[in-house]
């Protein structure tokens, strides 16, 4: 793709998200979503092949359906409230339809079907954008309308997402699909706390983006897309492979790594609000996520058959992929837990 064309498309996608995040007018929010959608399709198909085209088509159809539902909810709300501003959703039907549309855009269960397939069919860079930047716009709208959301619907979707995110990743050997199911589970944790403490949702999103960014950058540095290719990199880049596994354990929420922070704080906040069954169920379901990350780490590092490196002088060549801020991201993705007492004051 021409660099100028790619820069223009990327700028449009960023502008669309920024319009959604900064607008208080429903029509501008819808326009921002459409700008972002039309610009992100060529980014998903940057390396043109049938799989990328299929993934981009699935993404477009899902997001277009969600946008249609969103506009329907906006019009219903306009009929009852006679205003375009995001203050309160006055009609229960509009609230349910709007929540469904935003859940579909985020890839939460039961509308999660597109996330693993789309992520698997696109390159690692596009997958990184899809699982991080593309979550910001719908989550910012959910953040703004949190007081008007149907609580039962949101909690059901959150619990299902945590369950699907853990259950779906159990049999996967593709790293991109594992990251997709991890994303579904993390989105479930964020929406579970949204109505109780929106600030904690924002903090959870920040930590999730940081960990996902680190993991994808390490995948790109190591050129790994499957668990088999990851296990074969031990004798070539043992340090990077070890860091990938530690970061993935952090994504699973293993203490004392950074990924444990959001789970700890969310369970604590839900318990403060006299909710016992919900956090208990979430913690049990989160063990599924941690299990497949632990199994991946075990199978990749401890059960690998001894092999020699047949690629001579591999260590003498300088890696052309320069990622200068990766060490900082790795430290923040794994060692933030001591800062939890400070973060707990951000209510």
Curated annotation (Swiss-Prot):
The chain crosses the membrane at residues 1-21, 25-45, 60-80, 89-109, 111-131, 149-169, 178-198, 201-221, 242-262, 274-294, 323-343. Its main location: mitochondrion. It is a multi-pass membrane protein. The keyword Membrane applies. GO terms for biological process: mitochondrial electron transport, NADH to ubiquinone; mitochondrial respiratory chain complex I assembly. Keywords: Electron transport, Membrane, Mitochondrion, Mitochondrion inner membrane, NAD, Respiratory chain, Translocase, Transmembrane, Transmembrane helix, Transport, Ubiquinone. Its EC number is 7.1.1.2. Core subunit of respiratory chain NADH dehydrogenase (Complex I) which is composed of 45 different subunits. Interacts with TMEM242. This is NADH-ubiquinone oxidoreductase chain 2.
């Amino acid at each position: 793709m021409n660099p100028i064309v790619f820069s223009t498309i990327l700028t449009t996608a960023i502008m669309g998200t920024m319009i959604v995040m900064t607008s208080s007018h429903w029509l501008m929010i819808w326009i921002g979503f459409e700008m972002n959608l039309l610009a992100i399709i060529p980014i998903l198909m940057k390396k043109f092949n049938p799989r990328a085209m299929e993934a981009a088509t699935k993404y477009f159809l899902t997001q277009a359906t969600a946008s249609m539902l969103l506009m329907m909810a906006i019009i219903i709300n306009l009929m009852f409230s006679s205003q375009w501003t995001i203050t309160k959703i006055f009609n229960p039907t509009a609230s349910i339809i709007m929540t469904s549309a935003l859940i579909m855009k985020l890839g939460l269960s039961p509308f999660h079907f597109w996330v693993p397939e789309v992520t698997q069919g696109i390159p690692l860079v596009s997958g990184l954008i899809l699982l991080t930047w593309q979550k910001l716009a719908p989550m910012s709208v959910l953040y703004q309308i949190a007081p008007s959301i149907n609580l039962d619907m949101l909690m059901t979707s959150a619990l299902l997402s945590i369950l699907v995110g853990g259950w779906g990743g159990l049999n996967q050997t593709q790293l991109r699909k594992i990251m997709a199911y991890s994303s579904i589970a993390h989105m479930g944790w964020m929406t579970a706390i949204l109505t109780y403490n929106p600030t904690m949702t924002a903090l959870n999103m920040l930590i999730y983006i940081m960990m996902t960014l680190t993991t994808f950058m390490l995948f790109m540095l190591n050129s790994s897309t499957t668990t088999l290719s990851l296990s074969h990199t031990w004798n070539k880049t043992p340090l990077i492979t070890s860091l990938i596994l530690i970061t993935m354990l952090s994504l699973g929420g293993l203490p004392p790594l950074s990924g444990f922070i959001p789970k700890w704080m969310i369970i604590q906040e839900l318990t403060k609000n006299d909710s016992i069954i919900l956090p208990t169920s979430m913690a049990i379901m989160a063990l599924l996520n941690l299990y497949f990350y632990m199994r991946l780490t075990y199978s990749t590092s401890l059960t690998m058959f001894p092999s020699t490196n047949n690629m001579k002088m591999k260590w003498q060549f300088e890696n052309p992929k320069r990622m200068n801020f990766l060490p900082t991201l790795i430290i923040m993705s794994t060692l933030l837990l001591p800062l939890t007492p400070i973060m707990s004051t951000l209510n």
